[in-house]
Amino acid sequence: MKKNNLKYILFPWIKNTPQKKFSNLSLDSRKLTSKDVFIAIKGTKKDGNDFIFEAVKKRVVAILSETKEKKKHGEINYINNIPILSFFKLSEKISNLAARVYKEPAKTLKIIGVTGTNGKTTVTQLINQWSELLGKKIATMGTLGNGFYNALKTTKNTTSSAIDIQSFLHIAAKKKINLVTMEVSSHGLVQNRVKNIPFYIGIFTNLTQDHLDYHKNMKQYESAKWSFFSQHKIKKIILNANDKYAKKWLRKLSDKYTIAVTIQNEKQKKYSTKWINATGIKYNVNSTDVEFESSWGQGILSTCLIGYFNIQNLLLSFASMLEMNYKLSDLINTSIQLQPILGRMQKFDVFGKPKVIIDYAHTPDALKKALNAIKSYYKKKIWCIFGCGGERDQTKRPLMGSISEKIADRVIITNDNPRNENQNKIIKEIVQGCIKKEKIIIIPNREKAISSTFFKANIDDIIFISGKGHENQQIIKNKIINYSDQKVVIKLLEKKI
């Protein structure tokens, strides 16, 4: 990539910027080179301004330092001939700056952003699968990683940094990809990571309790999600209008192009530009048939995905495909070929052994919906294995304990990612929500919890393992341990018992 000119990148926000050539922007002082510009902003845990001298030692081209004082904006100081430019509300402009560095890649792409508490990964991956089935190559960013369908590189966050996003879009544009799906988290919205991105389609899945350690209350959490539709450029908005928040937003978005997606709730269509409504659902042994009516016509979608909530996810994906002008008949004919997403209601079924389902459900609402979905398909005993993450929203722990105890026949409480929090404290807080303590088994070691349950369960039983989904690591204190629920289950299923 050609070198960038600092003066051009910062115009018109800072006047008298020195003419400096540089290669990249960086938020991480550990990864700096002498060709970079260091962006020093306050993060959730650390403040980049504390690492300015480290950047100076690495002889960076320049440093942009976020200031809280408006009057200091545009001030330029020098240390060892390295300019340090004060920038008021810098974090809000990083997306713009990075877009300039990477030559505005979003302008050549159609970008679909998906936000919501649960379902972001499933919706993006269903769009990816469907596009591939119908002959279109697609790039994606999200929880499972960034990259191209079936070739993803693991990432730390659901929504990458503003700089990494623009870098990825630049790569996608160079490879002549013209469609990108992106999971948009509430953290990503609050931290302005997608601020400069023009979305062709914005999708909302649902809003339920999660991340209250970060957002403090549901009002702030709702505000973060709503900002996606109220403060960002989105050409077409698709809402799960069965959700109570979406119903409210649909009315507030009356001047926008909206698509209301509902299940047995046709009232919402009068508030939207276009609509899809599922009029009937038939659960079969290995599939589900979804009868629908819509602005595009009517028909039946068949799917092998498990659960009512996955019907919602399917319909949201369906709406986005229709909005990208795919033929209704082609989508109907290929819907049955869509496969379950890694770690999302992923079924393991071997003759003569208990059935196992692995899911990422780590919120009260997701756990409840997953367990109810299993109950609607299978009438035998349900064993539920789950834990809660450390250093995360503590208020959901007893709620998840209560939900699991009410729906499952036996509940095995174990570790998730305890991080630096005491594992026994986490487990105790989960148990506080349980009334029927005789249904509860506590096995902190996750692998032992799964294997113990596997050998206790009858072959007709269902073992539901929740919380980690696709993850292949476990965080205990400051150690990251290689661990995968899938690998543990496959190992058990392959054993000759």
Swiss-Prot record:
This protein's pathway: Cell wall biogenesis; peptidoglycan biosynthesis
Pfam families assigned: Mur_ligase, Mur_ligase_C, Mur_ligase_M
Domain of life where this protein originates: Bacteria
Keywords: ATP-binding, Cell cycle, Cell division, Cell shape, Cell wall biogenesis/degradation, Cytoplasm, Ligase, Magnesium, Nucleotide-binding, Peptidoglycan synthesis
UniProt keyword ATP-binding present: yes
The record's account of how the chain is modified after translation: Carboxylation is probably crucial for Mg(2+) binding and, consequently, for the gamma-phosphate positioning of ATP.
Positions of modified residues (N6-carboxylysine): K225
Positions with a binding annotation for UDP-N-acetyl-alpha-D-muramoyl-L-alanyl-D-glutamate: L27, S29, N157, T158, T159, S185, Q191, R193
Motif (Meso-diaminopimelate recognition motif): 416-419
Chief location: cytoplasm
InterPro entries, A to Z: Mur-like_cat_sf, Mur_ligase_C, Mur_ligase_C_dom_sf, Mur_ligase_cen, Mur_ligase_N, MurE/MurF_N, UDP-N-AcMur-Glu-dNH2Pim_ligase
DNA-binding in keyword set: no
Binding site for ATP: G116, T117, N118, G119, K120, T121, T122
BP-aspect Gene Ontology terms: cell division; cell wall organization; peptidoglycan biosynthetic process; regulation of cell shape
Protein name (record): UDP-N-acetylmuramoyl-L-alanyl-D-glutamate--2,6-diaminopimelate ligase
Top-level taxonomy: Bacteria, Pseudomonadati, Pseudomonadota, Gammaproteobacteria, Enterobacterales
Gene name of this polypeptide: murE
